[in-house]
């Protein structure tokens, strides 16, 4: 075998470098992909050329076989546009190439796939057309400059192939030699699609914010939209006409507009009570006038200036007159006689009557209209060094940071006491800090951070490995040196061709090509505009290293392939579903009307009534949105197994092997190359030929004297049989034909292409031609028609088959959700209210006197109190009372709040005007000590005393309650008045009707130091209510449930509501006996008198015992509301309802009067105790009956609770005990 020649294509390392550089500079070099061919095997048994000669030039005279030398085989490739009738001439428009000498007569390179010597790579910088014609020639190298090379065999193949990483295997089985090869088309990095012309490189900068999916579609990052994802998605509802944004979620208003959505115009400066439809207008609201809408035409209704039930009359713009009721005067009826009588000034403030009512001069430490606001002693902050000030009563407290201490955080704290230093020699205290003297190798304030020796050592993004007292730099590719400081020069080998200048870069190089050359090594001389990559009539301009398409006005993109959405960059106004108006300087009106693109690139929109539309489709398209390409292959125009490829209003036939022509109607003449030797006659077959040999020659091409069969006679594993005058091939399964060259089962059966895709056979593989709207190797991936974001205002895009539909967010409509629905169109606001349209809603601006969402509600007058305007129906607290505005009238509950607690020896007076802080009496101190505690008293005002007495009860509008407290749960310094004040401030009293006046007074118990007697009384009671009983029941319920956040309630041990003692029903006997004695004295009948006296005393003793039973019955009436949870009725138990007595009187007072104590023997007791859970238990107990034996009523006794009963003295009284 001759030594291989030095010709051939560059080695594999250089080709990889070329591919890398093209990928990095795809925009510059213009290459979008490459066609690859790899030789797998060669069979040339006799070592012959196509013309029948031997590669070595000498043939054995006996058997006519070539004996001297084998062929030096190499291959040439020519790639051109698809030809239905293949011609050997013409340029290789898609590229050409060759291999070096890779073998002899017969060789097999399948085991060494990936070897660079048997591969040919043809880069292309145009949109890959998928259909192609390939010419492959096997040549014999002569290895000298005189003798030309000779062709061994050539093959041609026309077909279709999609870009893929998978190889397709093709075979040449006719002629002198047989060879097998594989092909594929791959796209360069960042290029996608069937044509490798969809460019997508992820980026996140000014020019775009997107990633790329597997099909090369730009997937916008969240918040971005547009073809290049460089248009920010504004805040939902942002006016497309008056707002814009540069960042997602923003909404920047144009000049003259404002609001969250830039949909509210800015009124004229100084416009007070006016609105606008366009900027700088001032359209007055109802009852307002003037140029700036500052003249009130209904001053009375707007301001309600007349106080104290004065009548207001409008007399002109901003003018009114008040008619005051008796006892009031002034322009607004604000002057009241004797305004200070109600003592309105709190905290020892002094009241002075003025022409407008009164003014309060507050004592030190208090401020406000009524001196009710405590002055903040922490303003300004008295705490130094960042201390937090806590306001106290007439003082403050500083919470200091850890570095400071002292009353005002003025002293430096010694931080070294906490031993913060970890790996240090010593700790030194500093002002507001400390210093640690670290040991070698440690750093940080606490010497707890190990020093990183790698810090700042390695350069050029090298990684550093920290060592013990050292480091080591691991350099990235392209750098060297101890610190990776030296850039490796990739230009040292001068890789650039044709005068290109090499520019060294990091781990790579770049060739700057002269004019007319391009490619990664300046090896290509290509006109980038041939063929024209620009679409839609755009003109192509060739540049030194790229091309430029000048797009028509309505198209954009690198190749002018995308419809331009003018409204993404320019403010548009929606006219209807088909048309939007955009600003333009090219028309006299300054407006240009453009399509909304709802019908896509293949149709024109026609507007219909009711906001609907229809699409008028271009030729070759149909469907609602003109998204379906009409199938021109439906009539099966391709013959003889040809595959029809549908185009736009056209089709193309891809012929099977052996056929050619526009409709594959012509059988290819396989005898055109005269394959039969030594006078043999060639007969053409389908994709094959047959030689009728003469003069004793045999074989496929009449080239043998010995046998009709050789290794290349039968293809695809067929077995050849010599039948003397001819040969016969026995084909394996799946193959047929004279030489087993026709596939019986096509790789397209069954059709592997989905969704209407067309399958094209390519050797032992197939290629799917997908319908528009589908992608992928077998057409299973639906093209994302929703990218990038065609729907406005947060509309949801529904992706279809080559179409999309926008499902609009609430409040928007239109094919792309650009139309904001006007909810005010139905006039939802009542009584002349102004309707303001909003996103998916509206707002009604009500005229005076109306309120509600639609202004249907008629509102009352507002109230003016303490200089504040209170809306009708509003509630607020005033000391211990609750007030409410009711149609201009202030209604407050009438609970007497009592004297206010205060602190003695304060620098400022805490009491209201006219009062002073007086020390509490010793017997009023409930939880000792009460040092410094006082009460606000006035010498002119006498303390309010309740009208309740020891025998008062509900029918007297009174109640007497005794509270027993657990003092261990109470804070020192509490007085009786403190406890009483907290009772008056309970929420249950704030809901009492304003028609009643409630008084609560408290006194300490004389017999027990943990008890307080509370008297509740009411005045102005109508016949239809009993507030005292209601308040008493609520207090008992509050205590029993431990409800509320009051510490007072938590400390209550028990509550006793006392009854009035029953009067002895024998009191009427005294006058009766006197009358009898008088009659006896007059009649002088001593015997009769003695008999009569004895007679009357006997019934008296019976009458004396009767009240006990009645008294027992009287208990039940008071307990109708309280159910005994542990009560059980035995067989001998009398039902409780039998003890009811409607005439019984109820008394709830506990007293220590000696006369009452003597009558306690006639009283019964009801008692409820707290065990683990609150329960009510009624106990009825007497010490002794007249007979001398103790009695217990079975209905009111429970053994489980008797263990907790009070002493005999306590049980002689009848009470509620909680």
Curated annotation (Swiss-Prot):
Interacts with NOTCH1, NOTCH2 and NOTCH3. Residues 230-263, 264-294, 296-334, 336-372, 374-410, 412-448, 450-485, 487-523, 525-561, 586-627, 629-665, 667-703, 705-741, 744-780, 782-818, 820-856 form the EGF-like domain. Residues 34-1067 are extracellular. One of its GO terms (biological process) is negative regulation of cell-matrix adhesion. Ligand for multiple Notch receptors and involved in the mediation of Notch signaling. May be involved in cell-fate decisions during hematopoiesis. Seems to be involved in early and late stages of mammalian cardiovascular development. Inhibits myoblast differentiation. May regulate fibroblast growth factor-induced angiogenesis. Residues 1094-1218 are cytoplasmic. This is Protein jagged-1. The DSL domain is indispensable and sufficient for binding to NOTCH2. Gene3D superfamilies: 2.10.25.140, 2.60.40.3510, Laminin. Its main location: membrane. GO terms for cellular component: adherens junction; apical part of cell; apical plasma membrane; plasma membrane. Residues 1188-1199 have a biased composition (Polar residues). Residues 1181-1218 are annotated as: Disordered. Residues 1-33 form the signal peptide. It is found in: Membrane; Cell membrane. Glycans are attached at residues 143, 217, 382, 559, 745, 960, 991, 1045, 1064. It is a single-pass type I membrane protein. The lineage of its organism: Eukaryota, Metazoa, Chordata, Craniata, Vertebrata. The chain crosses the membrane at residues 1068-1093. Disulfide bonds join 187-196, 200-212, 220-229, 234-245, 238-251, 253-262, 265-276, 271-282, 284-293, 300-312, 306-322, 324-333, 340-351, 345-360, 362-371, 378-389, 383-398, 400-409, 416-427, 421-436, 438-447, 454-464, 458-473, 475-484, 491-502, 496-511, 513-522, 529-540, 534-549, 551-560, 578-605, 599-615, 617-626, 633-644, 638-653, 655-664, 671-682, 676-691, 693-702, 709-720, 714-729, 731-740, 748-759, 753-768, 770-779, 786-797, 791-806, 808-817, 824-835, 829-844, 846-855. The gene is Jag1. One of its GO terms (molecular function) is molecular adaptor activity. Keywords: Calcium, Cell membrane, Developmental protein, Disulfide bond, EGF-like domain, Glycoprotein, Membrane, Notch signaling pathway, Repeat, Signal, Transmembrane, Transmembrane helix. Residues 199-207 are annotated as: Important for interaction with NOTCH1. Residues 185-229 form the DSL domain.
